[in-house]
Amino acid sequence: MPLSADATAPLRFVLVGGGPRGVMVLERLLAQLESRDPAAPYRPLKLHVVDPYPVGPGRVWRTDQSELYLMNTPSFFPTAAAADNPGLRPSTAAQSFDQWRRVNPEAALGVQRNQYPARVVYGRYLTELWSHISGALRSRPEVASLTEHRAEVTSLRHRPEGGVVLTLESSDGSGGKTLEADAAVLALGHQRARLTAHQARLAEAASQHSGLHYQGPQIPSDVDWRTIEAGADVLIRGMGLNAFDILAQLTQGRGGTFHRTGEQPGRALRYEPSGHEPVMHLMSRRGIPYLPKAEVTSFVPHGVTLSYLSDAAVQALLDRHGVLDLDEHVWPLLHRDVVRNYYATMVRTQPDILGGPVAARRFLGELVALLDDAGRGAPVTARHAEELLQRYAPDRRFLDIVAYADPYRDDVFDTPQDYHEQVVSLLEQACVEATLGEDSPFMMAVGALHAGRLRMKQWIAEGKVTDSSRLKDVQAWFEPLVEGLSSGPPRWRVEQMLALHRAGLLDWIGPVPSVEVDDAGFRARSPKVGDEHGQGPASVSGTWLVEAMMPPNRVQAGSSRLMRQLLEEGVAAVGTLEDAEGALQPAAGFDVTSRPHRLKAADGSVDEDVFVLGLQLAGVQWGTAIAAEAGQDPAGRAMSLGDAEAIAAALLARA
């Protein structure tokens, strides 16, 4: 029982954001309450969750969206609660998505372990998970109340006597309500953001031209795609995951149907139009969409090994240098692992390329001996290995994983048809490779690259990578490399894109495109694709321009009232990274401490009452949008769960 009158005063904690990460904090808080000594004294807790959308699914995973929007991870991957994650005691309400969908097959639409669920299905999981967590919290003696507020937080300020006061505006438009708390957790998720200067010019030009429409970066489920007219020419900029969601809405969402053809991967689908589709013209810097993921049974293929980027090798680098530089320390080791996994798989599955099984094994032995010889950088290793490959397979080029990610870097095309044929060939082969899974040398090379990316994420979060390397390496070239190769959609999304092209409803504009507005509407050109008459770059015009991307995850670009207030009043500050010249560059996220990620104010002081979780940690973490992985380490692949555990512990330390 409480020991004093002061100890009886309830502690008030506010979760600003009721999506998956807000749920994580309260699941971790529940687990810690369930593991406490029942005889220990405590202060009652008054818990508040504020979100304009339903708690659990929040905005992104809300349960009223189209079933055509897919997750980018298979069922076995995500969790919003500690589910067999080492070092974390699960609460009585804990359940991973895979555990939930096995006992709720109808609500899960029958999705299987290796399939990619609809986002609405994940929202159903989050809804039920929150129901269990909130029910368990309300039954705890320590919890005096748990209140959900369907509202938006528009400001957060400090009270002179300690704690914070938040201003809430309800979803019905009524504002002015305040909420006082001893501590707050900012689990904000995706936020609205300002357009860039270029985007703003295009939006303004569209507003001045009757019949032109500009759709800026947005969560696809927040857009009414029905406003795009049938037959309209739509320029779609970006060929990542949002683009595939948009294609689904503009085709299947309008009554079109994909049929299986029985043909090989890459030609597995035929599209039957409804007659209500627009014509879609896609463009991106690289000129190709994200490639399909390998069809494997784990997030990193089981057969991938990091022989060179090993724990021992990295620890030796840290002992010698104190910190890591991706280009100088990590990439030479990871590049060797990429090469080794590629050719080891080729020897196992395609030995005839290297002269048969005996010759292939001999080649691999010589290659491994070459790779084992330390001291080479990636270019030297590649040159020596290419000389070795020429002795066994003179007609083969040595693996250039960077060229795979940007295949048209040095190419030009005489006509759009030439370019389209190259894209189709590349995507059809990518579908074949995805189907081969662990038997594909290419997919195993990508798997090694992906495994290295996961290691880098952990080292960045642990402060083991220099700021300058994050700027000049991770952001500049490594992130685009791994995103394009290993963060793509399931193969069926690429099959659908190819089927739409064969149906005459989709084409690609070309690499490094530019967009302007003229009398014909929006006009896009690629300097690498000529027109049919040799008169310069081919151009495509349209009445719609759609930015197929999420609003940028940069707090400095945030346009929500809360984000602006926090930064303008100095309650929060933008994090910084020191470049190679010693200049401070703005980071994507807030300035925070290490775990439990307390917010720092503009004057550098640490705010003991405000914690940050999720996307706005992008200044100290990399890849903050991805979910926690079920069964994985909370210091690594389940990092957001580890962050939530630390925040819950810091909150309860006050009780």
Q: Where are the language model's segments positioned?
A:
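Flavin (primarily FAD) cofactor-binding/catalytic cores of flavoenzymes
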Residues: 1-63, 108-654
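Redox-cofactor-proximal catalytic regions of oxidoreductases
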Residues: 50-108
